[in-house]
Amino acid sequence: MDKKKGILLVALGTPRSCEADDVRDYLKEFLGDPLVIQKPRWLWLPILNGIILKVRPQKSAEMYKKIWTDEGSPLMIYTVAQAKQLQDMREDFDVRFAMTYGEPRIDKVIAEMKESGVEEITVLPLYPQYSLTTVEPVIQQVKKIDDKIKVIRDFHKVESYSDLLAESIREKWQANDYDKLVLSYHGIPLSYVTKKKDAYEEQCKETTRLVVSKLGLREEEYEHTYQSKFGPEKWLEPATIDRVAELPKENAKKVLICSPAFVADCLETLFELEIENKEVFVENGGETFDFVHPFNDSLDFTRVLSEVVDQNRL
């Protein structure tokens, strides 16, 4: 008799609400992870607890309020939809979802899957590119529970992923006369690449190479940037927010921006890119700033997830 199989989709996480107390709880867990902030605990924890968690939750809560919906967090809404659609598509699997930080917790969901009779679990972190700061925390949490569970490290080279990403950009790119396409990835500290040998930067660059090749873009037609810098440390560059300020002065006044590292809308896409970066672009003389949303609840993306699982189970 075949073993009962399961798929666990894992997203980063989201506060329970957009109120400051819930944002504080979320940030404490997220920023307290030594894989996310790789500083000595004796140095970092007093800064986190004594300064950041007293100031940042209220500021972040105001940002969350600008993107929160009647149904809740966009990231939660779309992650739930992705899991449901994948379950509908793959009746041969028990499909669940969890969050690295916040609820539902990875350990709790895996326990529920095992209690229901699932014997073979494949964990798919919802990040096309691997990073020590995103996928590795999932790997470590799963390893503590059951080191026999397979965790998929990345899927940026899966053809259907880059095809779908290119197609989502092509629809807008061809319909408008843009001066520049900006591919904005979530940034990480430079030291994680140079000292910790994080593969993230190279995988982001490979994603861009694949996409612009499919789109047939010349080098001068696109930019590869990094967003969401946090703290004083040097991060991967160029910074998205710096480039969107400079582009209008370089005669690129009509820009299309997308975020290939995100597969669902969240604070970084809906607030940081669509609101904050757009304001900076317009303030510096920009005219058109359009955004290609992540895949969200696209059925085509659900098919990509299904293919990723199959390719990694062979």
UniProtKB/Swiss-Prot annotation:
It holds the Pfam family Ferrochelatase. GO terms for molecular function: ferrochelatase activity; metal ion binding. The keyword Secreted does not apply. It catalyses: Fe-coproporphyrin III + 2 H(+) = coproporphyrin III + Fe(2+). InterPro entries: Ferrochelatase (IPR001015), Ferrochelatase_C (IPR033644), Ferrochelatase_N (IPR033659). Its EC number is 4.99.1.9. GO terms for cellular component: cytoplasm. The keyword Metal-binding applies. Its main location: cytoplasm. Pathway: Porphyrin-containing compound metabolism; protoheme biosynthesis. Disulfide bonds: none annotated. GO terms for biological process: heme biosynthetic process. Fe(2+) binds at H186, E268. It is found in: Cytoplasm. Keywords: Cytoplasm, Heme biosynthesis, Iron, Lyase, Metal-binding, Porphyrin biosynthesis. It is an enzyme of class 4 (lyase). Involved in coproporphyrin-dependent heme b biosynthesis. Catalyzes the insertion of ferrous iron into coproporphyrin III to form Fe-coproporphyrin III. Belongs to the ferrochelatase family. NCBIfam families: hemH. This is Coproporphyrin III ferrochelatase. It comes from Lactococcus lactis subsp. lactis (strain IL1403) (Streptococcus lactis).
